[in-house]
């Protein structure tokens, strides 16, 4: 690692710690040439493979932007959107794969969005799942009602559910 101060091509790691809830490693380094210290943060790169085959780095901002569009006119704050994006990133990282298809990112968005705002969920799902008729919306609304009833029943019985849609 080059020193950012004197550009010396080597540095020594003084301390390493987990950061960002284990998603990154923060390293404190020292330059043997100038003696100054600096910090680096290392993260595993997560790439999204688009339908065209092109890969690009996963972006929480892109998730927030897409979900924000679905939430337009709804009472959803930025903190909730950022939390949703973090949940999506955690879910796709949990797959253990360095490259994830874009449709899996979309699937990872659906469940947390359903829990956040049902109208925004319907808007997002209608685009993501390519709804072409009112029947598609009706079917999705029926699924949402069943999902809500199941969650309510599980909550009443004290059971915890994990949704696998």
Curated annotation (Swiss-Prot):
Domain ATP-cone: 46-136
Listed cofactors: Zn(2+)
Gene Ontology molecular function: ATP binding; DNA binding; zinc ion binding
Assigned keywords, A-Z: ATP-binding, DNA-binding, Metal-binding, Nucleotide-binding, Repressor, Transcription, Transcription regulation, Zinc, Zinc-finger
Zinc finger (unnamed) residue numbers: 3-34
Entries under InterPro entries matching the protein: ATP-cone_dom (IPR005144), NrdR-like_N (IPR055173), RNR_NrdR-like (IPR003796)
Cofactor binding remark: Binds 1 zinc ion.
GO BP, sorted A to Z: negative regulation of DNA-templated transcription
Disulfide pattern: none
Similarity section: Belongs to the NrdR family.
Function: Negatively regulates transcription of bacterial ribonucleotide reductase nrd genes and operons by binding to NrdR-boxes.
Protein name per UniProt: Transcriptional repressor NrdR
